[in-house]
Regions:
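Catalytic-loop region of hydrolases
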Residues: 2-15, 26-187, 192-195, 226, ...
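Alpha/beta-hydrolase fold active-site neighborhood
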Residues: 45, 56-58, 320-459
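Alpha/beta-hydrolase fold nucleophile elbow
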Residues: 236-248
Length: 460
């Protein structure tokens, strides 16, 4: 299934800068409540069924602590300039078999600027997804603002590619060039035949994941990524973890805090995912559709308030009408032959995700309404010549699918999906069906699906 038209959970820095100063410099956000675990894994908060993994991560962390990280200048292809340094941390593919197959996780860092006397340790970042790379974190925040400069005095900034992502044993589910081809089918089905076609694509995508990355799939889970985090912590020589997670990264942080409560020093979470096990992940995506609709309306209100600039209407209803006209036009004949409703949703989806995208998207939309179709085509159409970018997009989508589908059990009965999304679409049409097709491979996922951890949260 080719799904590059839908971007996944935000992989961004968002408003985390303010949280870094308020929290990292002052104190910790409460970690998820859990009982402490001895170093050998006995009495682990999830000892029943998790004994092997608990012991495995202890073994892997001890190895990593001895090995450390062989920091070097980053490979030119990573586009991470000096003084950022890069390296790898070795972890087991399967923590139940710590002496079995190993994979390497890419990490990078930039040292704290305040000297040894001010240093409070390493700050490890996850941007969300799942499927987002954190390697750009040190480069993007260094010198970005006074807020980050203050945190940089005390912390080494550390990024990493989670397992399966980028330079860390990357997985794939489809040919990247086929993955990005456009236009895709309209996500909103007009008939039962449309639904059958989308179901077929979802089933084929799940099969492609197994064919291309079958060995990795059973181990592409949030708990395993949390275990990887603990091994990285050990490799860095840190007794406790300082962590910043955004969007999905907040769930990763919650799982880490549940598995390793004694290893948490300070933890900052921004744009929080509800970690309740009955939400992960089917219900969470339905809830996300509701949130998207609310944010979509907020953007439309902002556009209407700035009608003197964008000329898209001075009420939300008028802006929505312009959107529906655009969508109908693209459904009838894709703009430039490549931008249909799916590509439009992918482009406009950034508005609900990021306030910083509001003005650029409104400006492009305004140009279209004024007669400049090409500006919108250039912004929304895939670039088939960008082979590296397309490979990255396909990889990110593969990891997203693998983690969410393997993390938890999903409905296997199509009638459940059809009922829930048909109902939800009536009042929340912007993303509902696009999100449904994005996740439908989980209904026919070819490897065993796990039961989410019972993340017990405490007061923050």
């Amino acid at each position: 299934m080719s799904k590059s038209s839908i971007r996944r959970r935000a992989t961004a820095f968002g408003s985390a800068g303010a949280l870094v100063t308020a929290t990292l410099m002052a104190g910790a956000v409460s970690a998820p409540a859990a009982s402490a675990a001895p170093a050998d894994g006995r009495g682990h908060p999830h000892a029943r069924g998790w004994d092997k993994e608990a012991r495995g991560v202890t073994i892997a962390a001890a190895r990593a602590a001895r090995a450390g990280v062989d920091w070097e200048d980053c490979d030119a292809g990573w586009n991470l300039p000096k003084p950022i340094q890069c390296g790898y941390v070795t972890v087991p593919l399967d923590y139940a078999k710590p002496f079995g197959k190993q994979i390497k996780l890419a990490v990078d860092r930039i040292g704290n600027t305040g000297g040894r006397s001010e240093r409070q340790g390493a700050l490890i970042y996850n941007p969300g997804g799942p499927g987002g790379s954190g390697l750009r974190f040190p480069a993007r925040v260094t010198g970005k603002s006074a807020v980050w400069a203050n945190a940089a005095k005390a912390y080494d900034f550390v990024g990493f590619d989670p397992r399966g992502v980028g330079h860390s044993a990357p997985i794939s589910c489809a040919d990247p060039q086929e993955f990005v081809k456009a236009p895709k089918a309209d996500p909103v089905p007009g008939s039962e035949a449309d639904k059958l076609a989308q179901r077929k694509l979802a089933r084929e995508y799940a099969e492609g994941c197994f064919e291309r990355s079958g060995e990795m799939l059973p181990h592409m889970t949030t708990p395993n990524t949390a275990r990887d985090l603990d091994v990285i912590r050990a490799a860095l020589g840190e007794k406790k973890l300082n962590y910043l997670g955004v969007s999905y990264g907040t769930y990763l942080g919650a799982v880490y805090g549940t598995l390793f409560p004694d290893h948490v020093r300070r933890m900052v979470v921004d744009s929080v995912v509800n970690p309740s096990r009955d939400k992960i992940w089917y219900q969470a995506n339905l809830d996300q559709d509701v949130a998207f609709e609310g944010r979509w309306k907020e953007w439309q209100d902002w556009v209407a308030a700035n009608d003197a600039t964008y000329h898209l209407g001075d009420t939300r209803a008028e802006v929505q009408d312009q959107w529906l006209k655009l969508r109908a036009t693209a459904a009838k004949e894709p703009l430039g032959g490549v931008v249909g409703p799916a590509e439009l949703i992918s482009f406009f989806q950034s508005a609900p995700y990021y306030d910083s995208a509001w003005a650029p998207i409104a400006a492009t939309f305004s140009k279209y309404v004024a007669g400049d179709t090409q500006a919108l085509v250039d912004a929304a159409a895939p670039d088939l010549s960008d082979t590296a970018g397309n490979a990255s997009a396909e990889n990110g989508n593969a990891v997203y699918t693998a983690v969410e589908c393997t993390d938890a059990k999903w409905p296997t009965d199509w009638n459940t999906w059809d009922r829930d999304n048909t109902r939800l679409h009536r009042d929340h049409p912007f993303m509902t069906w696009a999100n449904a097709w994005m996740n439908l491979p989980c209904a026919t996922w070819p490897v065993k699906q796990q039961t989410p951890l019972n993340v017990k949260t405490g007061k923050g």
